[in-house]
From Swiss-Prot:
It comes from the Eukaryota. GO terms for molecular function: DNA-binding transcription factor activity, RNA polymerase II-specific; RNA polymerase II transcription regulatory region sequence-specific DNA binding. Pfam families: Homeodomain (PF00046). This is Rhox homeobox family member 2B. It comes from Homo sapiens (Human).
Amino acid sequence: MEPPDQCSQYMTSLLSPAVDDEKELQDMNAMVLSLTEEVKEEEEDAQPEPEQGTAAGEKLKSAGAQGGEEKDGGGEEKDGGGAGVPGHLWEGNLEGTSGSDGNVEDSDQSEKEPGQQYSRPQGAVGGLEPGNAQQPNVHAFTPLQLQELECIFQREQFPSEFLRRRLARSMNVTELAVQIWFENRRAKWRRHQRALMARNMLPFMAVGQPVMVTAAEAITAPLFISGMRDDYFWDHSHSSSLCFPMPPFPPPSLPLPLMLLPPMPPAGQAEFGPFPFVIVPSFTFPNV
């Protein structure tokens, strides 16, 4: 048999690899813990408010660290447990980042929604037809205010800015309303004046038509004028209105008798030329 010293040395040589493996695993666990702490500090610096994903990752890291510290399994099992901690860590980080990305997308959608809400009214306003556009409101004056404005218009059709402002202040209306009323009143007055001028021009246009007058009517017209009574002119001048002129004289009803000339004598018997007699017109004057 071998001596006891050799047996003890052999046993220590057999057990030394296991002890070395345990030390290596402890060192590896310590390194993993230090790495997890550094990653945790970086995440806290990058995200001051930890989210649910990071909290779940921390729980998984602590559970993996506790499982690595236990010495129930062999070296390979411990290696697998130690290597699983970073895997859970990255899964937790991915979940946290996905959650944060989801929150960012939600915030972007919430930011876009007001823009869409504002853009819809703009489109609705742009789609309005010209016929549906609201007309500007016109102020309705009271009868007393209209009477006052009419009196001012009779005195001055173009009021100054100071007068318009004073009227607006006294009537408790805007200056624009007063200005619009005066513009409309001037337009109405111009239309009335044009209508009066057109009505007065109609008789002149009727009298101005050309009339054919014969020589007999031209000769007899002064006789009819002298034979008319003064009552005719008086009645017609007063019966007609001031806007219309005096009507024209009526044409003669019956023509005067033509002058009867005797037959011409022969040329040899004429003593005083071709007309040896005196022509005396015979006119009958009407009884006055």
